[in-house]
Amino acid sequence: MTVKKRAKALTGTVAGVMLFSVLAGCGGNSGSKAEPSGSSGNAAEKQVKLRMIESLTSPDRTTYLKEMLARFESQNPNIKVELISPPFDQADNKIKTMLAAKQDLDVLEVRDLTVAEFVNNGYIEPLGEYVASWSEYNTITDVSKSVGSLDDKLYFIPNGMYQRQLFYRADWFKDAGLNPPTNYEELVESAIKLTDPNKNRYGFSFRGGSGANAVPDAIIQNYNFDNIDHEDPNFLNDGKTMFSTPEAKQALELYVKLFKEGSPKDSINWGFSEQVQAFTSGVTAMLLQDPDTIPSLKEKMDISTVGTAPMPKGPSGKSFVFAGGAGWGVTSYSPNKDAAFKLIQFLSGAEENTAFAKATGLVPIHTSASEDPFFQDAMYKSLLEMGGKPDEYVNLKANTKYPGTGKWGQVAMETGQAMLLGSASIDDTLKKWDEYWAKERENYNAK
């Protein structure tokens, strides 16, 4: 999941070093100095029913979220919350349909991938006025605030932060005499060596379905490392898209090889759940994923067989890393905005957010969580390592300003599957991707 990104690394503590320094530094308030509407008397004086929808749905996450809502309701007996939990692969479309029809909805989970589209369509409320006098906002990390903002306006408060690392079967690597890969070429070579279809063993948990764009985007960016525009990372410093270069073709050739020679054939349709299940069930040796997979790995695997490694590097010897997130926003047409923000304030407070992060495998948004022993776990070791080497693992904020960002995953999945199945060439696929992003920039600049 994607969720976009930037931060400075702290040193020493997990939250400072860990994970793209997601727990790094807290900034001052932004927005107006008005009293936060969430603390107004109206919400406390009348009976209110809030409708809330989540996007990154999973059974365990939904169960824990309901426990949080029950605690909120016990402290606020005048406010009742109805939680809508669509299946993960359908959730964003469900949210967009409800917003377009202005169906009853007060609180929604906004993603870094959807915020530009929602803002462009006027679906969500800026939160600057609401957070201005909320004391705990001061301890939310700068990177969390950045992920929840667009054009310097805050639109959602992240419920946790994401950054990918490599999970690998340490026992398989040891038996094969392999070291964990440090770059994408080594990753593909290791995947091929560890693949044995006769044993139903494959090197890599490929994801060709929903969310398929994450890996090819990352490889292409890293193969264009020295020329990427850090303020607009699907583009180069000369204004062309990153898909227009010879390096992009080299990267995509490697990606196709990874699928054809090191991954299960049916993984062309896999989404998040399938790729994680393949790893936990002993079908695949490597998985590139966010820390929210950690609880599942601990539950379903002998964790001593799992190793972690930093994200692979490109030919430059460096790697871009991304901090992303999703979180809670308020619909622009909600009649209950004060009560809605009161709920968000509760869910986003340091105590509740840190507990939620532990339950879901995310990184908390508050700097006060930085010394928590929970995050000293070995599963977070590589995240810590990447955060401690900011010149080697360079933080990059993906651009969320383009309305087409939310549609890119679907476009990349459909065209990418055609390429992997051989019905489209690598050159033709790159041309389509280049045209897509060039048009996005053209439309954006024409506004």
Predicted regions and their residues:
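Conserved N-terminal structural module of periplasmic/extracytoplasmic solute-binding proteins
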Residues: T2-K4, K8-G16, F20-Y123, A132-S135, ...
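Short, solvent-exposed loop/beta-turn-alpha elements that line the ligand-binding surface or hinge
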Residues: G128-I140, G208, F225-Q250, K298-M301, ...
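Long, aromatic- and glycine/proline-rich binding clefts that accommodate carbohydrate-like moieties
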Residues: P77, V306-P310, K358-Q410, Q417-A418, ...
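Glycine-centered hinge/linker elements that transmit conformational signals in sensory
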Residues: A191-K193, N237-I268
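Periplasmic-binding protein-like
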Residues: Y64, Q345-T367
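Hinge/lid segment of periplasmic solute-binding proteins
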Residues: P87, D112-Q165, N179, V188, ...
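Extracytoplasmic/periplasmic substrate-binding proteins
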Residues: S55, V115, V215, E253-A339
